[in-house]
Swiss-Prot record:
Assembly, per entry: Homodimer.
Protein's UniProt name: Aspartate--tRNA ligase
Annotated spans, Aspartate: 194-197
PANTHER family documented for this protein: ASPARTATE--TRNA LIGASE, MITOCHONDRIAL, ASPARTYL/LYSYL-TRNA SYNTHETASE
The family this protein is said to belong to: Belongs to the class-II aminoacyl-tRNA synthetase family. Type 1 subfamily.
PROSITE patterns listed in its UniProt record: AA_TRNA_LIGASE_II
Record carries keyword Ion transport: no
Record function comment: Catalyzes the attachment of L-aspartate to tRNA(Asp) in a two-step reaction: L-aspartate is first activated by ATP to form Asp-AMP and then transferred to the acceptor end of tRNA(Asp).
Positions that bind L-aspartate: E170, R216, H438, R478
Pfam families tied to this protein: GAD, tRNA-synt_2, tRNA_anti-codon
GO CC aspect terms: cytoplasm
């Protein structure tokens, strides 16, 4: 037997027991000849005492940190002055037996050391030994376990869908897998199980879920990985409200399982409201600083920059913030919004009851009216922008609002809401056509589509759950009629031949009795990161890739042999 107890298990009530522990050596101290070993495993830490007269004392001189050892001994209570607040801080083990199970070379760092992320990912097996990292993975497990528990108790079936499937690129690039048996043909790794879960609804499995790996070959950011995990859900005979209620209850349940209480009812705002107030379709409202329309205050202004914008049919917006402001800071903010195509920002501050600004002599009356309307307090600042493209201005001010918030506003707690009534389509400059904003299987508002509404204004039966400024889940009611699905394919520029080639199997399935259905998918990585209080999802993934898609532990992706390429019928093209 390697152990009778774990390193986080023993308490004062175990005094006098003979126990066996196994684990890693966290540290060794020598106090007047008495050796103290802190032994660590996944469950915690326990102090082991080796007295000079112990038969195992000589062994202690030949062990170091991160050795794996087995210790047998008697549990005793520590002296009152030696008790620590840790769960096992009341006791220690007096060793009578000690065995070295595995030696350790001098590691490049010790678990918990402050080292670069590159080092942590290269030696991930050392990094995961850090209790903080270990606890992140335990938390992730608890979220997944609670998900299965909740959905199983609500009549959902966990059904696995294929990883090797057909390439139907709409949006991000597919990861392609060459077929050895059918040379020149390729599987794709799924970006989501979207079509399979809809086909399961057509099959009569009315409540499906899966905790599933998905793959997207895209340029990466801090919150993206080429492979990621979704909590995937689909339901038959549902309206949007049914899916939203189920999803909200699920997220409340799984967060409660790890000790986080979310609001009893999530707020709901439209996409248009989110963009107008926060400049983002995933707003973090904890920062405050709602954007407001200020056009009315400047309609008679002679200030050249604003006057020209308004003459072109543009508008003026801004937000109030309790932050320091100077010409230098204003210049920094102007440079920031220039990255979004704006010319810069205007600003004014209420100081000693007076308007302070580099443009006060031109716009003092306008600034005073704004200050009065929005009840500005001493020291508050208004940041203002003007542009003839309202979408671009919303995006720029929204990004600036986030930058200011992260710099100056201390936030805590959880802001959870739904964003609904998304545009069904968005224009792709790159492709010169409309593309589906979510995916082309989302049900549009039929009254918009058939009522002559401009295509860019057609709404979708789509909904996103946002927590603390992160989109943690997105879903929609799906198209369950073949004629509507074919019309949508036509709108996004797919010919009948292309639609048949890519989605013929699905269009065929839509002919054989399809229940109205809808669903949602949550990012488990992001849900875990928010719960753990970390910004980067790599902190809650055991073996993540870098921002360039590399696994530093295994050095994947890597070259393969010519024999492997020949078997697949693949010839590599030299890059120019």
């Amino acid at each position: 037997m390697y152990r009778t107890h774990t390193c986080g298990e023993l308490r004062g009530t175990d005094e006098g027991k003979n126990v066996i522990l196994s684990g890693w050596i966290e540290r060794i101290r020598d106090l007047g000849g008495v050796k103290f070993i802190v032994l660590r495993d996944r469950y915690g830490k326990t102090q082991v005492v080796v007295n000079p007269d112990s038969p195992v004392y000589p062994i202690v001189n030949n062990i170091s940190r991160e050795y794996v050892i087995q210790v047998e001994g008697i549990v005793r209570k520590r002296p009152a002055e030696a008790i620590t607040p840790e769960p096992t801080g009341e006791i220690e083990i007096v060793a009578s037996e000690l065995k070295i199970l595995s030696k350790s070379e001098l590691p490049p760092f010790y678990p918990g050391d402050d080292v670069s992320e590159e080092m942590r990912l290269k030696y991930r097996y050392l990094d995961i030994r850090n209790p903080k990292m270990m606890n992140n993975l335990i938390l992730r497990h608890k979220l997944a376990f609670a998900t299965r528990e909740y959905l199983s108790n609500n009549n959902f079936l966990e059904v696995e869908t294929p990883y090797l499937t057909k390439s139907t690129p709409e949006g991000a690039r597919d990861f392609l897998v060459p077929s050895r048996l059918k040379k020149g043909n390729f599987y794709a790794l799924p970006q989501s199980p979207q079509l399979f879960k809809q086909i399961l609804m057509i099959s009569g499995i009315d409540r499906y879920f899966q905790i599933v790996r998905c793959f997207r070959d895209e340029d990466l950011r801090a919150d993206r990985q080429p492979e990621f995990t979704q909590i995937d859900i689909e339901m038959s005979f549902v309206h949007m409200e049914d899916v939203i209620n189920l999803a909200e209850n699920l997220i409340r349940y799984i967060y409660k399982a790890i000790g986080i209480e979310l609001p009893e009812k999530f707020d709901r705002i439209t996409y248009e409201e989110a963009m107008e107030k926060y400049g983002s379709d995933k707003p973090d409202r904890r920062y405050g600083m709602e954007m407001v329309d200020l056009t009315e205050f400047f309609k008679n202004s002679d200030f050249k920059i604003i006057k020209e914008v308004l003459e072109r049919g543009g508008s003026v917006k801004g937000f109030k913030a309790n932050i320091p402001m100077s010409r230098k800071i204003a210049d920094e903010y102007s440079e920031f919004v220039k990255g979004f195509g704006l010319g810069g920002v205007l600003w004014f501050k209420l100081e000693n009851g007076q308007i302070t600004s580099t443009t006060a002599k031109y716009l003092e009356n306008e600034y005073k009216a704004i200050a009065e309307k929005y009840n500005m307090n001493e020291g508050e600042v208004f940041i203002i922008a003007a542009h003839d493209n309202r979408e671009r201005m919303n995006e720029a001010l929204g990004a600036l609002r986030l930058k200011v918030g992260k710099q100056y506003v201390k936030v805590s707690g959880f802001d959870a809401l739904w964003v609904v009534d998304f545009p069904f389509l968005e224009w792709s400059e790159e492709e010169g056509r409309f593309v589906a904003r979510h995916h082309p299987f989302t049900m549009p508002y039929i009254e918009d589509l058939e009522g002559g509404v401009e295509l860019s204004k057609v709404r979708a039966h789509a909904y996103d759950m946002v927590i603390n400024g992160f989109e943690v889940g997105g879903g929609s009611i799906r198209i369950h009629r073949r004629d509507i699905q074919e019309k949508v394919f036509d709108i996004i520029g797919l010919t009948k031949e292309e639609a048949k080639e890519k989605f013929g199997f699905f269009l065929d399935a839509l002919q054989y009795g399809v229940p109205p259905h809808g669903g949602i998918a949550f990012g488990l990585d992001r849900l875990a990161a928010i719960a753990a209080g970390v910004d980067n999802i790599r902190e809650v993934i055991a073996f993540p890739k870098t921002s360039s898609g590399t696994c530093l532990l295994t050095n994947a992706p890597s070259a393969v042999t010519q024999f492997q390429l020949d078997e697949l019928g693949i010839a590599l093209k030299q890059s120019q």
